[in-house]
Curated annotation (Swiss-Prot):
Official protein name in the record: Probable truncated L-gulonolactone oxidase 7, mitochondrial
Domain of life: Eukaryota
Alphabetized PANTHER family for the sequence: GULONOLACTONE OXIDASE, L-GULONOLACTONE OXIDASE 1-RELATED
Keyword tags: Ascorbate biosynthesis, Mitochondrion, Oxidoreductase, Transit peptide
Highest classification ranks of the organism: Eukaryota, Viridiplantae, Streptophyta, Embryophyta, Tracheophyta
Pathway per the UniProt entry: Cofactor biosynthesis; L-ascorbate biosynthesis
Presequence range in chain numbering: 1-102
EC main group: oxidoreductase
Record GO biological process: L-ascorbic acid biosynthetic process
Gene3D superfamilies cross-referenced by the UniProt entry: 3.30.70.2520
Length: 252
């Protein structure tokens, strides 16, 4: 009786919410928030948070793994930035703050080669005008560059802005072995895109140097035009990490 009931319930469940294996489809159809993708027409009240028709979630995410041996110095540098301007990280608090998690090393080819701390920062990005700088734009850019360039942080492969992936593949000792395996298993490049070719260093470049490229994370500024000079944001050295080049609001 119990087995029959379970079979009946399973069959009913599959007919309602499951269409069978394999589970293949567009990413926006695989990942959902409850039933928001298939909800009734109700003025978009139950739309998914990422639905472009509504003013839903829209932000940048910087997610980087800092080697455990460098974490103390990295945090102290961030503290030094906050000491200069205590309000500089308030934008992070509007979202999730700074999420931190421990990760261990792995034998995988594109692995964390040593124990590390993952830092996840979620912050504002204008939906209407992608070239609009954020409040305290320079502080966020400096933290990002500090982690990548000074402390040799590794980017989360599924997050981050373009500049985080510039040269990232070279930080992995077994990158060439991975690429050989990739070529052997996928010689036709069916699982490759222009973007994956760029971040794996196979073709093209992830950075795009043009007017206004820095606020969008397409480049590290080297000229005022890469920021938003018409809105007072100029390319300047970092405040703590002097080698950084960030878009700073110049008021005088």
């Amino acid at each position: 009786m119990k087995r029959s009931m379970r079979s009946h319930l399973a069959k009913q469940t599959r007919s309602v919410i499951f269409t069978g294996y394999p589970v293949i489809g567009s990413q926006d159809r695989i990942m959902s928030s409850g039933a928001c993708l298939d909800s009734h027409q109700n003025g978009l009240i139950t739309s998914c948070p990422w639905d472009p028709r509504i003013k839903g979630e829209f932000f940048y995410q910087t997610a980087l793994s800092v080697p455990l041996t460098h974490v103390k110095d990295f945090i102290n540098d961030i503290k030094a930035l906050v000491k200069i301007e205590p309000k500089s990280l308030c934008g992070l608090e509007l979202n999730y703050g700074v999420l931190v998690r421990y990760v261990t090393s792995s034998p995988a080819y594109l692995r964390k080669e040593e124990k590390a701390l993952d830092f996840d920062l979620t912050y504002y990005r204008s939906k209407d005008d992608p070239w609009t700088p954020r409040l305290y734009e320079d502080y966020m850019e400096e933290i990002e560059q500090m982690a990548i360039l000074k402390y040799n942080a590794l980017p989360h492969w599924g997050k981050n802005r373009n500049l985080a992936f510039d040269g990232a593949i070279k930080k992995y000792k077994n990158a060439n072995t991975f690429l050989k395996v990739k070529e052997r298993l996928d010689p036709w490049g069916l699982f490759s895109t222009e973007w994956t070719d760029q971040i794996l260093g196979l073709k093209g470049n992830v950075t795009i140097v043009k007017q206004g490229c820095a606020p969008e994370g397409l480049c590290i500024c080297s000229d005022d035009s890469h920021c938003a000079p018409n809105k007072g944001y100029m390319c300047r050295p970092g405040k703590v990490y002097k080698e950084a080049r960030v878009c700073t609001l110049v008021t005088a």
